[in-house]
């Protein structure tokens, strides 16, 4: 049964040369609240066929009655081009959600660093909207090519001006002459280890990291080199997903202990590996990676079906419901954990 419902475009606002925001409402039907950092899933009927895409919610989670997504126009992105060129105020888009586990830890009390690259700032802006209402110290760090592609800058500047303890730093890779005249950026080039070290006070921060894979890999390695514990870094990719820790530190083939008697076990039958499920991995996909396997994946959120695998024994629980119905004997390993001992054809 489809969980998609139509959302009407009530406003369309160009935020930069490449990014446009769409404000969405559901008429008289209340919209589900969302956690800062979550996204909506869209089925978009482009001239070349229907596509499924995720777009982060970029507005305030306290703005009841409507959602906002901010979409970057991609050269090879049929869905983003369609949204930019053809979708107008009054049109409807089919959406499902909110979804996603990349969310602000609102119960925490540590200072927060929101570190983004390009259109990766969109979930960070939603987080900033929530953080300004509290007392935690927040540093909003954003990197992009220049002022013409810097979306939501005025909004971020207004938010960090609302109370003490909030600040922003914008790094432009190739600032224009106009950027230099207006002086609305703080540094030039890319965020370096030395620069991040100078911006961060000696403290125990929670880091949230979002952007394209090259930016993410560089920033993750830099933060780790500064001694930031990996448990303090939450991240989400904009673009093809990968595993940051594996990219930064290729791991040797792991030692696989013999399964314990009475434990829930996971058997990767084709690989000849059986191991205990201890709960240390956050999903069956993560466990497979811990065992040195390389299953296909992309979204890590139950949406793209890239990780769909055959399960020949046992049951799983989904912590994120699959977007599409699965046939008997199929499982999405990116968003599931074993309920009983399981056998996967991997």
Describe the residue ranges of each PLM region.
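Active-site proximal loops enriched in glycine and acidic residues that flank catalytic Cys/His/Asp
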Residues: 211, 237, 268-270, 279, ...
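Local cysteine-cluster metal-coordination motifs and their immediate loop/turn environment
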Residues: 123, 289, 293-317, 327-340
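Ferredoxin-reductase
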Residues: 2-92, 109, 144-147, 157-159, ...
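FNR/FR-type flavoprotein reductase catalytic core
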Residues: 81-258, 262-270, 276
